[in-house]
A protein has these predicted regions:
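Phosphate-ester processing/binding pockets and catalytic centers
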Residues: 1-244
Length: 244
């Protein structure tokens, strides 16, 4: 039996890394919002407050999901919400994340160039996940913490768990190979509609991908996107898109 006294000489912080994806046919991105307990609480409370402000209007409810693509494009549950209101929601959400104490890690890959260069390329999600986890591991190490990874549900999640286990035993592929010593357990998958933290990761990753792959033709739209992203820029711990 392990006693409390036996644990006290080895204190360790724990952070959570919430991961989501965004992609086009040519580029694939993953983003992680890395939080301690206090930052997680600030994001949950902040995003809940934003949605509550709009509950009862435009068909929205207190449980409406903050999902990057529908919110940005005015689709699905955001179909009846005016553009100005959607911009307000997105910017307020990014302000909450930026002020929470969270750190953001962003990785991507040029999928078109990968297909052109390799005869039998690895799935983009697997490649970028390895790159992202390396940087989340670095982020946790600098914080003097271990990290638990939580990702949005995907149909290939069992394969990602297997890859994660292989990374931790044999090392990640590539020149920065590491066994991810700061990451613990497995990758945990959860439905984003029940997690404001996963929604935060989705909002961040979608807008990062949008800005990287789709320059706005309208100067006003570009200015709005820049203003929204300005809340995230100061808390980006790492950002890179691999060009094979």
């Amino acid at each position: 039996m392990v006693t409390t006294d036996a644990l006290t000489p080895y204190p360790s912080r724990l952070v959570l890394a919430y991961v989501d994806e965004s992609y086009t046919s040519d580029r694939f991105y993953l983003g992680a919002v890395v939080v301690d307990g206090a930052a997680a609480e600030r994001i949950e409370e902040g995003l809940d407050a934003i949605v509550r402000d709009y509950a009862g209007r435009f068909g929205l409810s207190p449980s409406t999901e903050l999902h990057g693509n529908p919110l940005f494009q005015g689709k699905d549950m955001w179909n009846d919400v005016p553009t100005r209101a959607r911009i307000n929601v997105y910017e307020r959400a990014m302000e909450v994340v930026g002020a929470s104490g969270a750190r953001v890690v962003l990785r991507g890959m040029n999928v078109r160039r990968q297909r052109e260069r390799y005869t039998d390329p690895h799935p983009p999600h697997e490649v970028v996940l390895g790159h992202l986890l390396e940087r989340v591991n670095d982020c946790a190490r600098r914080a003097g913490a271990h990290a638990l990874v939580v990702a949005d549900e995907v149909h290939t999640q069992e394969r990602h768990r297997t890859n994660f286990r292989d990374f931790r035993t044999g090392g990640t592929p590539g020149y920065r190979s590491t066994t991810l010593p700061q990451l613990i357990d497995t990758i945990h998958f959860a439905p984003s509609h029940h997690s404001r933290l996963l929604q935060a990761a989705d909002l961040v990753t979608f807008l990062h991908r949008r800005r990287a792959t789709h320059p706005e033709r309208d100067a006003r739209a570009q200015a709005a996107n820049d203003a929204i992203w300005s809340h995230i820029t100061p808390v980006v711990d790492h950002e890179l898109c691999w060009e094979p």
